Amino acid sequence: MLFRSKDAPALQAWYKRHLGIDVQAWGGAAFEWSDAEGKPIAGTTAWLINPAESKQFDPSKASFMVNYRVEDLHALVKALKEEGCDVLDKIDESEYGKFGWVIDPEGNKVELWQPPAGQ
């Protein structure tokens, strides 16, 4: 989950103080997954607060962006395009995985993330 904030450092501090979220220098936190018994399993949920002027949310004007973990980004992007969805042409690939984006019918930018193998 990604948020856009008018005062990112202050909002990050609020979440850290009141909800105990361990906000890192990059502006967010990563929550490791576990099963119902508390045993670690592969996966993380990213949580991030960005400054209001961040271009990461463009072309959406929303103050948030949801990130969905996907199994095969290239196949999903292809299917979404075939279904007539507004898919951004850019796909980013890095050590953090593959990232793509689609705009939902209300204009919200949705991030699609395929993690690296083994995560």
For each feature predicted by the language model, list its residue ranges.
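Short amphipathic beta-strand starts and helix->beta connectors
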Residues: 47-52, 85
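Short secondary-structure boundary/capping segments
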Residues: 37-40, 55-58, 91
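Generic structural signal for residues positioned in beta-strands
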Residues: 30, 46-48, 65, 111
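Vicinal oxygen chelate
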Residues: 1-6, 22-26, 34, 52-119, ...
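Core segments of cupin and vicinal oxygen chelate
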Residues: 2-46, 82
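Active-site donor-binding loop signature of nucleotide-sugar glycosyltransferases
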Residues: 33-35, 51, 93, 114-115
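Short, solvent-exposed coil/turn segments
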Residues: 26, 42, 59-63, 95
